[in-house]
Amino acid sequence: MASKDVEEGVEGPICWICREEVGNEGIHPCACTGELDVVHPQCLSTWLTVSRNTACQMCRVIYRTRTQWRSRLNLWPEMERQEIFELFLLMSVVVAGLVGVALCTWTLLVILTAPAGTFSPGAVLGFLCFFGFYQIFIVFAFGGICRVSGTVRALYAANNTRVTVLPYRRPRRPTANEDNIELTVLVGPAGGTDEEPTDESSEGDVASGDKERDGSSGDEPDGGPNDRAGLRGTARTDLCAPTKKPVRKNHPKNNG
C-alpha cells in the first residue's frame, strides 16, 4: 500500500527498479518504452553488478556498460550457505586432485624404475585399474570445478567491480534524401563506344541521307524514280571506290 501511495503522489517518469521519481537523473538504457523507458543509473548499475546481466530482459538490447575494478578489493565477500558449500567443494576437489596426481605419478615412477620381479603382475594390474578410475573421477570433477568456479568468479566480480551504464543510442534511420536516390548511367569515354552499329541502323541512316539529298527542294527530278535509283547507285559507287595512290616516277622499282 505504501508503494502505491508513493506512485500515485509522484508526477513524471518513475524508475522501474526503485519505483521512485527519476527527475533529471534518469537515462534511457535500452529500447523499451512506457514505464520501462527511464531508470536511475545508480539503480541499474547496482542491479547489473549483482545479477551480472548484460542485456535487457524485455527488448533484448545489450546495455552499453563500462566495468571498473574497485580500489580496495574484498577478498572474502559475504556469501550464502549454498555459495559457501560450493566454495568448500571447489577447494576439496582441487586439493584431492593435486594429491592424487602426485601419488599416481610417484607410484608409476617406482614401478618403472624397480628391478624385474619386484612387483607381481596382479599388483601392477591393480594399480593400472586404480589409476584409470581415478582419471575418470578427475575428468568429472573438473566439470564440477568449472561450474563452481564460474559461480565463485561471478560473486567475486560482483563484490569488487562497479558497472557504469551509458545511455542507449538508437539506430539512425535513413533520411528522405537517402530514400530517393536515383541511379544514373555513366557515359563512356570520349571517342565513342566499342559497339558496332547493326546492319538495320546503317541502312536506315543511308536511306535517311538519300531522302534528305533528294527531297531538299521538295520537287521530284525529271527522270522519275528510276533516275533517283541511278543517282543513289552512282553516289554509293563514288563513295565506295578506292582511292589510287600517286606513283613516284623516280622510284627505283618503277625505273626497273
UniProtKB/Swiss-Prot annotation:
According to the record, mutating residue 59 to S results in: Loss of ubiquitination. Loss of B7-2 and ICAM-1 surface expression reduction
Ranges in the topological domain labelled Cytoplasmic: 1-83, 146-256
Q: Which residues bind Zn(2+) 2?
A: 30, 32, 56, 59
GO CC terms in record = host cell endoplasmic reticulum; host cell plasma membrane; membrane
Does Phosphoprotein show up as a keyword for this record?
no
Residues on the Extracellular side?
A: 105-124
Q: Which Gene3D superfamilies match?
A: Zinc/RING finger domain, C3HC4 (zinc finger)
Q: Positions of the region Disordered?
A: 179-256
**Could you tell me which pathway this protein works in?**
Protein modification; protein ubiquitination
Membrane topology for this entry?
Multi-pass membrane protein
Keywords for this protein: Early protein, Host cell membrane, Host endoplasmic reticulum, Host membrane, Host-virus interaction, Inhibition of host innate immune response by virus, Inhibition of host interferon receptors by virus, Inhibition of host interferon signaling pathway by virus, Interferon antiviral system evasion, Membrane, Metal-binding, Transferase, Transmembrane, Transmembrane helix, Ubl conjugation pathway, Viral immunoevasion, Zinc, Zinc-finger
Q: Where are the zinc fingers (RING-CH-type)?
A: 7-66
Give me the stretches of Basic residues compositional bias.
Answer: 245-256
- Give the stretches traversing the membrane: 84-104, 125-145
- State any GO BP term from the record: symbiont-mediated suppression of host type I interferon-mediated signaling pathway
Q: Reaction(s) catalyzed by this protein?
A: S-ubiquitinyl-[E2 ubiquitin-conjugating enzyme]-L-cysteine + [acceptor protein]-L-lysine = [E2 ubiquitin-conjugating enzyme]-L-cysteine + N(6)-ubiquitinyl-[acceptor protein]-L-lysine
Kindly list the positions annotated as binding Zn(2+) 1.
Answer: 15, 18, 40, 43
State the Gene Ontology terms under molecular function: transferase activity; zinc ion binding
Q: What is its EC number?
A: 2.3.2.27
On whether DNA damage is a keyword of this UniProt record, the answer is no
Tell me where in or outside the cell this protein is found: Host cell membrane; Host endoplasmic reticulum
Q: Which SMART domains match?
A: RINGv (SM00744)
Q: Tell me how this protein assembles.
A: Binds human MHC-I, CD86, ICAM1 and CD1D.
The UniProt function text for this chain reads: Membrane-bound E3 ubiquitin ligase expressed at the immediate early stage of viral reactivation to mediate polyubiquitination of various host membrane proteins related to the immune response. Promotes ubiquitination and subsequent degradation of host MHC-I, CD86, DC-SIGN and DC-SIGNR, ICAM1 and CD1D molecules, presumably to prevent lysis of infected cells by cytotoxic T-lymphocytes and NK cell.
Listed name of the protein: E3 ubiquitin-protein ligase MIR2
Lineage runs: Viruses, Duplodnaviria, Heunggongvirae, Peploviricota, Herviviricetes
